[in-house]
Amino acid sequence: MNAEIIAVGTELLLGQITNTNAKFLSEKLASIGINVYYHTVVGDNTRRLQEAIRTAEKRANILIFTGGLGPTKDDLTKETIASIVKEDLVYDEAALTSIREYFNRTGREFTENNKKQALVLKGSTVFANNHGMAPGMGLHKNEKVYILLPGPPKEMQPMYNSYVDPFLRNVTTGEHIYSRVLRFFGIGESQLEVKVQDLIDNQTNPTIAPLASDGEVTLRLTAKHQNVEQAELLIQQVEHLILERVGEFFYGYNEDFLHHKAIELLKKKGFTLACAESLTGGLFGNQVTENAGVSSVFKGGVICYHNDVKQHILQVPEETLQTAGAVSEECARYLAENVKLLLQSDIGISFTGVAGPDASENKEPGTVFIGLAIKDEPTIVFPLCLSGSRQQIRERTVKYGFYHLYKKLEEM
């Protein structure tokens, strides 16, 4: 089935707020096999909203609205949809009671216009708003499904997760929809697609949807079946075929992230980590410490941006800095080995390179070296040639650091 997301609010058109709801909803709908081909943003204007609805009805089975459910005159989503589907608006007593209780609890005066927020389309399924006042609703009418949700993300997102997701699963095909995301790193989107192109070309059930983001590639596999176990089996069969071809670049599923996976392995193996950061300037250490309980494995780090710090704190020989340079395999090796010794950790990882925008030491932006010293094993240096802005190069360098750390730990 196809859905269209219609965001209502003049503030969106003026650029006063960002439409994060569309991103959230698109991701959620994709995970249950509902296609989203159009995002529409319309201001607080009845005529233009009517036009947007009629256009959407021609190209989508499911129309999802965010915003315009509040108490003011310019909150007109419900009234406009009611006029189009020819349904009355009626008070939902549970919502009205909840709104009155909110005003009593906060000591604010309950004005008549606030009753408007409890109006719902007659015959609709009402979605309770556990984080605000205006309820949402879902109506199946004239072979279309109309979903109305509040605009504030803190209200809309939990409402979707608790009520809309099961509602949509029930009114679509009656089939179980099972989705799994495979995450890859160290391979480009085009390279990965070439290796699995025949599977993509011949996809039926499950479907395969590639997506590239920040140096990573994901494949979303979505299967439909009356039996949930059979839907999962369909996913597993295609996943096996994919990993036979590109398994060396695979690192996790769904909401797994490289830094989480690497830290999990560190904890599992009981190793400690220290880092020496030049071009990344603390980005790696920052991501490490985003993980709760990481003090058990992370000793700390040295931001060795200036050569004096490399030489006097991390004992990189002056000769190495003068001949090979700070941006070199030799320097990365010294940094990884010596930060490990300095902070008495099992593993030392180092980052040195040119973030740009200008060249340095006659080396182009994107020239990067990552050093990895693990216990008594020979130190490994990974050379990289990255592209992008200064910030993109730094962020991608950090991801490569976690990737190489994860892969090396996985081997041990």
Curated annotation (Swiss-Prot):
Gene3D superfamilies tied to this protein: 3.30.70.2860, CinA-like, MoaB/Mog-like domain
Disulfide pairings: none
Cited SUPFAM superfamilies: CinA-like (SSF142433), Molybdenum cofactor biosynthesis proteins (SSF53218)
Listed InterPro entries: CinA (IPR050101), CinA-like_C (IPR036653), CinA_C (IPR008136), CinA_KH (IPR041424), Competence-induced_CinA (IPR008135), MoaB/Mog-like_dom_sf (IPR036425), MoaB/Mog_dom (IPR001453)
CDD domains for this protein: cinA
SMART domains membership: MoCF_biosynth
Name of a matching Pfam family: MoCF_biosynth
Similarity section: Belongs to the CinA family.
Name used for this protein in its record: Putative competence-damage inducible protein
Organism: Bacillus cytotoxicus (strain DSM 22905 / CIP 110041 / 391-98 / NVH 391-98)
Gene label: cinA
